[in-house]
């Protein structure tokens, strides 16, 4: 039986259809918003997965190019691996849902969001986020807390709910808020230096707008939701936990109070070894119970240390930042490098400047088709002292790279001001928390070192939170390290400049964040950001005046659009000849703007002259140095500009009578000629005699002076 429910959100219809498709799925729904349609399927395994200590939730966001009327590019005309945007959307769906599943739930849960139709005004990712929550709520899977999601824009001081495409282009804020009825679950934002008060008010606006969607999901659950199954939860054997605690708690507490990370980890390893020796024979089948008991003790010690004793594991104050060092110009042949170190977290970023032809071409359902600025993030195993196979970037690396990219994107100069493609690569050399925000700082250093005229330096900081069980007590931590991230309740990343926020990403492990927590964290993050920006400016106050000697230079010129074909030539013959003779790269835009890129200024200037000659109009009265291309009995044809020939009549070759053209000029000779006129058919008439006379007259004038 099919069920339909509709509501109005921002003047557009949000609709869910249940029971129409996917009859064998636990829950399959079609959600639509305007003409954007996404199919959501939610399923779970019947039994918990054995031998794991985590909740195996997977979210897939499947883009179908038919949804926007496209055929995939390349030789294989079908969708392949998920695009980076699809991976980012899948992560955004996962993050607010994961904390709301029952603790100890170990069944495999998979959510598949397939984009079927896209109207550019209505974003499919926001619709998929709402649909994923709704599918879980309607299914028999033990998930009962609806999560609503909205997009917020900011135009001329007004907040816009779920902005259309034209509004998104005008907006200085792109904010996503995920919330339950009581609290904010997740925040993701890119902004053009928006101040903290405005950002907080935007989040509040988003939270309030989420409530109607929460009510919509609750109504759907009441009308046609399935009965929930009773979950089988993983629980530690209480007797084993009690024994392990009595044996190991004093040792765990002693170890967790060691401020040095390496020494603390060594001590914890010793404790684990002693626990293993003590209980291995007694409980040979209960390794997971013992490990979980040890984890709970470590977590308890760290959280009590912060909440009860008002101290941090490394003895810093709650608002204190770890020691920072900045360095630029590390690598001699790169175009720009920055090394940013904060405590035991260290990131090196390399900047590369390239021609506009190196832009990234995107084949996806998104509005954007080209990227001239990109940031990539690498997190190798050695950064945490571990070993594992080195493969391509995972979802986490893609997510961290995108966040750092978003933080700097509003600061990158326009194509008109800086006609280059820019690629940043952040290498995490050492990780002890907040590597994505260290990447923002390292990227700023690298851009300044490369001579890129960014608007202002940017910096990032990760804030944390520790709460008690009923969420009545909160301690906000500035610059969280690994242990505080691992055992804490929030990861609140803020990046921006001295003027405002450019990127924000907030995740939580609890059932949401209070208003006061969000507001206070934004204020504390600003103080930390200002401190870090001061350190960056001490290292390199502004961008270098010159690009690296190893970076290519771009030279620009503009021609009339109708002249573009003259530069390209038949089948690209002309432009390829210029490139071959000068060794440059040439990029021609539809509006007639031409970018010539080369590390050799001589070659670049030669190419510019060749293009100028190709596109320059012949003017009557001007004198040109031309080459004789052929002779006839009535005169000589002379090429005065590439592809432009004129005739010197035999009577105008010399001051005296000429009986034979070859007596004066031969094919291949370079001669001065004057354009006497251009007739209605575009034929150019030349005179060697007048050119010589004009040159002699000018010499006479100079001698008289």
Curated annotation (Swiss-Prot):
Disulfide bonds: none annotated. Residues 621-689 form the S1 motif domain. Coiled coil: none annotated. Keywords: Cytoplasm, Magnesium, Metal-binding, Nucleotidyltransferase, RNA-binding, Transferase. Pfam families: KH_1, PNPase, RNase_PH, RNase_PH_C, S1. One of its GO terms (molecular function) is RNA binding. The keyword RNA-binding applies. Its main location: cytoplasm. Mg(2+) binds at residues 485, 491. Its EC number is 2.7.7.8. One of its GO terms (cellular component) is cytosol. It catalyses: RNA(n+1) + phosphate = RNA(n) + a ribonucleoside 5'-diphosphate. Residues 552-611 form the KH domain. One of its GO terms (biological process) is mRNA catabolic process. It is found in: Cytoplasm. Its cofactor is Mg(2+). InterPro entries: ExoRNase_PH_dom1 (IPR001247), ExoRNase_PH_dom2 (IPR015847), ExoRNase_PH_dom2_sf (IPR036345), KH_dom (IPR004087), KH_dom_type_1 (IPR004088), KH_dom_type_1_sf (IPR036612), NA-bd_OB-fold (IPR012340), PNPase (IPR012162). Belongs to the polyribonucleotide nucleotidyltransferase family. Involved in mRNA degradation. Catalyzes the phosphorolysis of single-stranded polyribonucleotides processively in the 3'- to 5'-direction. This is Polyribonucleotide nucleotidyltransferase.
């Amino acid at each position: 039986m099919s069920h339909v429910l509709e509501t109005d959100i921002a003047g557009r219809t949000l609709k869910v259809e249940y029971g129409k498709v996917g009859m064998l799925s636990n829950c399959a729904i079609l959600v639509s918003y305007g003409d954007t349609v996404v199919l959501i399927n939610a399923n779970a395994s019947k039994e918990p997965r054995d031998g794991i200590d985590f909740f195996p939730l997977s979210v897939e966001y499947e883009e179908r190019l038919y949804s926007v009327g496209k055929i995939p590019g390349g030789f294989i005309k079908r969708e392949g691996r998920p695009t980076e945007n699809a991976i980012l959307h899948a992560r955004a769906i996962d993050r607010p849902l994961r904390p709301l599943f029952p603790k100890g739930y170990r069944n495999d849960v998979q959510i598949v969001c397939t984009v079927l139709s896209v109207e550019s005004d209505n974003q499919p990712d926001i619709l998929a986020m709402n649909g994923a929550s709704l599918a879980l709520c309607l299914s028999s899977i033990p998930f009962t807390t609806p999560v609503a999601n909205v997009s917020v824009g900011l135009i001329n001081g007004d907040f816009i709910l779920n902005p259309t495409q034209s509004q998104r282009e005008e907006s200085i804020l792109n904010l996503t808020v995920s919330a339950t009825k009581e609290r904010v679950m997740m925040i993701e934002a890119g902004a053009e230096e928006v101040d903290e008060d405005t950002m907080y008010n935007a989040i509040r606006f988003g939270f309030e707008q989420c409530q109607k969607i929460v009510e919509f999901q609750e109504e759907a659950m009441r009308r046609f939701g399935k009965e929930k199954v009773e979950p089988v939860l993983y629980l530690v054997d209480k007797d084993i936990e009690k024994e392990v605690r009595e044996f190991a708690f004093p040792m765990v507490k002693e170890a967790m109070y060691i401020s040095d990370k390496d020494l603390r980890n060594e001590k914890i390893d010793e404790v684990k070894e002693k626990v293993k020796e003590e209980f291995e024979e007694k409980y040979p089948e209960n390794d997971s119970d013992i490990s979980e008991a040890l984890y709970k003790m470590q977590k308890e010690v760290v959280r009590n240390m912060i909440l009860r004793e008002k101290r941090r594991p490394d003895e810093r104050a709650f608002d204190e930042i770890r020691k920072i060092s900045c360095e630029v110009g590390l690598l001699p042949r790169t175009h720009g490098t920055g090394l940013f170190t904060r405590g035991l977290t260290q990131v090196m970023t390399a900047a590369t400047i390239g021609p506009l032809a190196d832009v990234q071409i995107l084949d996806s359902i998104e509005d954007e088709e080209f990227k001239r600025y990109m940031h990539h993030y690498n997190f190798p195993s050695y950064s945490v002292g571990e070993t594992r196979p080195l493969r391509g970037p995972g979802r986490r690396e893609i997510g961290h790279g995108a966040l750092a990219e978003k933080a700097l994107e509003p600061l990158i100069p326009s194509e008109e001001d800086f006609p280059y493609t820019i690629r940043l690569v952040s290498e995490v050399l050492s990780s002890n928390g907040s590597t994505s925000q260290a990447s923002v700082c390292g990227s700023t250093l690298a851009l300044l070192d490369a001579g890129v005229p960014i608007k202002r330096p940017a910096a990032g900081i990760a804030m944390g939170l520790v709460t008690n069980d009923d969420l009545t007590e909160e301690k906000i931590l500035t610059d969280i390290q690994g242990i505080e991230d691992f055992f804490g309740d929030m990861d609140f990343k803020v990046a921006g400049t001295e003027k405002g926020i450019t990127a924000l990403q907030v995740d939580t492990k609890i059932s949401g964040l209070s208003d006061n927590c969000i507001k206070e964290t934004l204020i504390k993050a600003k103080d930390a950001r200002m401190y870090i920006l001061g350190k960056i400016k001490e290292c390199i106050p502004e961008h270098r005046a010159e690009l690296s000697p190893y970076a290519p230079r771009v030279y620009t010129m503009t021609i009339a659009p109708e002249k573009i074909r003259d530069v390209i030539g038949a089948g690209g013959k002309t432009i390829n000849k210029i490139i071959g003779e000068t060794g440059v790269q040439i990029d021609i835009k539809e509006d007639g703007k031409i970018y010539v890129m080369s590390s050799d200024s001589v070659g670049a200037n030669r190419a510019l002259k060749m293009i100028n000659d190709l596109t320059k109009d012949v003017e009557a009265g001007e004198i040109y140095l031309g080459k004789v291309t052929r002779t006839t009995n009535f005169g000589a044809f002379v090429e005065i500009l590439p592809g432009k020939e004129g005739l010197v009549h035999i009577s105008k070759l010399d001051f005296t009578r000429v009986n034979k053209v070859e007596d004066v000029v031969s094919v291949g000779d370079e001669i001065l000629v004057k354009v006497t006129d251009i007739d209605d058919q575009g034929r150019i008439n030349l005179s060697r005699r007048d050119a010589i006379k004009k040159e002699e007259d000018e010499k006479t004038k100079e001698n008289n002076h």
